[in-house]
Amino acid sequence: MKKFILIIGILSLISSSNAATITGGVEYTTTDARLELQNNRPTSADFILYGNNYIDAKRDENISALLKGVTKLNDRTLAQFSDDTYGIIYNNDPKHVWYYSNDGTLIYAEEKASLKYPYRTYKYTPDGELVNMTMRVSESETFIFDTLGKLLGHWVGQNCYDESGNIVMTRKISK
């Protein structure tokens, strides 16, 4: 009986040392996130929605707002990235994120599996090619993997880190 209790104690210490505790007690390691994404991968994207979003019709208004530091507008939320791209989430379509180049051309469309954390997202090119998969653990933490499951980045707050812990991109977050 003592051996059993000792083994259970050691196993619980080992497993908890390999995971990060997130708000609400949800734990995800890089491996957990990778497996969740690969095991639930969609077969295709819903491209009916993409047609109206190939060009950002409100590009000038969006860029102007971002230059002023405004990210929340009446019908949408904006995000600005350090590589001169930006993203839009429309209030009436919160399960999609549209990513545009600085000239307002669609470069990626992302589909969310849910709106409750933790949830999966899958990012596609306008031609429908899967680019990456993410596991949104919380509002401030996201794991990003390529289509083969290699970790591309780990967002924590405003910074995205590579596997070595180097900052590879930043973003502005509004509260």
Residue ranges, per PLM feature:
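Repetitive, compositionally biased segments used for assembly/scaffolding
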Residues: T21-K175
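Sec-dependent N-terminal signal peptides
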Residues: F4-S16
